[in-house]
A protein has these predicted regions:
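N-terminal export signals and maturation junctions of secreted/periplasmic proteins
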Residues: 24-78, 103-136, 228-235
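Bacterial N-terminal signal peptides that target proteins for export
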Residues: 1-9
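Alpha-helical segment that forms one wall of the substrate-binding/catalytic cleft
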Residues: 148, 156-163, 176-180, 187-263, ...
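C-terminal segment of classical bacterial N-terminal signal peptides
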Residues: 14-23
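Acidic/His-rich structured neighborhood in mature extracellular/periplasmic domains
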Residues: 88-95, 99-210, 224
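Catalytic and substrate-binding regions of cell-wall glycan-acting enzymes that process beta-1,4-linked
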Residues: 107-108, 113-131, 264-322
């Protein structure tokens, strides 16, 4: 009798293990683009490019030229990528996308260092109508976020509270724009601006600061010290770890939440670097695939946007750099 029970228990364990491995198997997302032709480029990007009297191809060649000609920059990208356990082509892809579609690259890396120093001379602060972000997040609506100790979940929670309570509303006599928290509180120059070689927003830097502290040993950033935040995202030596951390997080969250490995597809990591919201996008795709699996359908793969599409098109050139 005991032997029979043992056999049954063993069989059940083997069956459970097989089911568990199947349920949690991670699928490698194929390399390359899912879309045959490039998805549409936003009108704002096209307008900026026309105003600068240039073309996307010219802008691509400019940032690619910077990467190709600056061996020190390539070395820094390779080094930081090793630290964060990602392929350097992910960092290069994010740089290519940002400087092709969002801004125009400077010809030399030294220009970014000069710009970083100039920011230290400006008395910057993160506030809205005289209320600092530090005071703003002490409001009772944000109390639920205090349980989070890591910077990513803390600031992500605060973003959600902003969207659900303040965005587009009038609270206590103060009207708040129907815009992102990042654009309202974290852009002292003009809304929607990102900065530096990696074109990071201050809010993303604040979200990633704990990971960067853990992996690179850089000091943690504080929203009450805006100048240091801007110095970090403007200085190439400091911003590269934040780029790598952001890309690593996208890879990690898709593996953990959606059971998808996007580490071999730099077009997808570039897309997420461009759009943000990797956590929410991974959850949405996981829900879609759970339903598809229940219906006996194949998995839906994540798709690149216009920005990531270019990266995958140019991936052989980018890989050759390293």
């Amino acid at each position: 009798m005991k032997r029979t029970l043992c056999l049954i228990a063993t069989s059940c364990f083997v069956l459970f293990s097989a089911v568990s491995q199947s349920a949690f198997a991670v699928t490698l997302v194929p390399v390359g683009n899912r879309n045959v032709s490039q998805p549409g480029v936003p009108a704002a990007s096209a307008k900026r490019t026309r105003e600068m009297n240039t073309t996307y191809e010219a802008k691509y060649q400019k940032i690619y030229g910077l990467l190709k000609s600056d061996s020190k920059l390539r070395s820094k990208i390779a080094s930081v990528s090793r630290t964060y356990g990602i392929d350097p082509v992910h960092v290069a892809g994010a740089l290519i996308g940002e400087h092709t579609y969002n801004v125009d690259a400077y010809d030399r890396l030294q220009t970014y260092y000069v710009k970083a120093v100039s920011y230290l001379k400006q008395g910057l602060s993160f506030d809205y109508k005289g209320e600092s972000i530090g005071d703003f997040v002490k409001r009772p609506q944000f109390a639920e976020c205090n349980k989070f100790k890591d910077s990513l979940r803390l600031w992500s929670c605060r973003e959600n509270v902003w969207d659900n309570n303040f965005r587009g509303n009038t609270i206590g006599g103060t009207s708040y724009p129907n815009n992102r928290l990042s654009a309202v509180f974290f852009q002292p120059f003009y809304a929607g601006q990102s900065f530096g070689l990696g074109q990071l927003s201050p809010l993303v830097a604040l979200q990633m600061t704990d990971m960067v502290n853990r992996y690179s040993g850089l000091p943690k950033l504080d929203a009450d010290h805006a100048t240091e935040v801007y110095k970090t995202i403007m200085d190439p030596d400091l911003t590269l770890p934040y780029m790598a951390a952001t890309l690593k997080h996208s890879i990690d969250v898709y593996r953990r939440v959606a059971d998808l490995d996007i580490s071999k597809n730099p077009g997808l990591t570039a897309t997420l670097y461009n759009t943000g919201g990797a956590d929410a996008r991974a959850r949405a795709l996981a829900n879609i695939n759970a339903q598809r699996s229940a219906n006996g359908e194949s998995l839906q793969m994540p798709e690149e946007n216009y920005y990531g599409w270019l990266v995958n098109e140019k991936v052989d050139q980018l890989k050759a750099l390293f």
